[in-house]
């Protein structure tokens, strides 16, 4: 419902992991292995992104399936059923394909891509922290997604905790807050030359 678009559950811990875009898959694999998650629902922005990520997980023997609009209804139902029955560890989904997914006791929801529409964040993570259980909403954020992250924080009226993962510290830093001067993009390196040539 529209009234709940900016509400997130009290039982959800939110974590932002700043990381360079090119290393997102590597970081996700590291988290899955080190945190020993039983299962997790992972959101990507595009169908192609969902397929690509699922193949990367398969390569390192993480049992996963992808669901999106290009999959047949039958394929989607089978993947969902396998996930509900603990036959697969990771379900990679797009926002559209995930509509109507009802999985009880989902401990982790991971935003591999920051949603372009802030209220989709609320819908995505609403699948964890149910029934009195604690849940985790983990978002991998690259520097170019900072504006989208700020939109989410404004919507839910909450500053989300940034946690850098050792070995995955980003070259392009995700700022804590908007800079008054847009030229200072707060990067360690990579944007310096371009910034010098920009006027305002």
Regions found by a protein language model. Name each.
Residues 173-200:
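Intrinsically disordered, Lys/Arg-rich low-complexity segments
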Residues 1-173:
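Conserved helicase RecA-like core
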């Amino acid at each position: 419902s529209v009234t709940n678009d900016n509400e997130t559950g009290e039982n959800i811990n939110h974590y932002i992991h700043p990381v360079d875009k090119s290393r997102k898959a590597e970081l996700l694999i590291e988290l899955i292995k080190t945190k020993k998650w039983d299962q997790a629902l992972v959101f990507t922005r595009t169908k192609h992104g969902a397929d690509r990520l699922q193949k990367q997980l398969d390569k390192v023997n993480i049992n996963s399936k992808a669901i999106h609009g290009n999959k047949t209804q039958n394929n989607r139902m089978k993947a969902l059923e396998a996930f509900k029955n603990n036959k697969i560890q990771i379900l990679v989904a797009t926002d559209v394909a995930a509509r109507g997914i009802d999985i009880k006791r989902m401990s982790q929801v991971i935003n591999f891509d920051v949603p372009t529409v802030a209220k989709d964040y609320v819908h995505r993570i609403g699948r964890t922290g149910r029934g009195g259980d604690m849940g985790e909403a983990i978002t991998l954020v690259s520097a170019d997604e900072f504006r989208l992250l700020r939109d989410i924080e404004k919507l839910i009226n909450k500053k989300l905790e940034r946690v850098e993962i050792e070995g995955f510290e980003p070259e392009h830093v995700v700022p804590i807050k908007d800079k008054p001067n847009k030229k200072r993009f707060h990067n360690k390196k990579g944007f310096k030359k371009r910034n010098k040539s920009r006027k305002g």
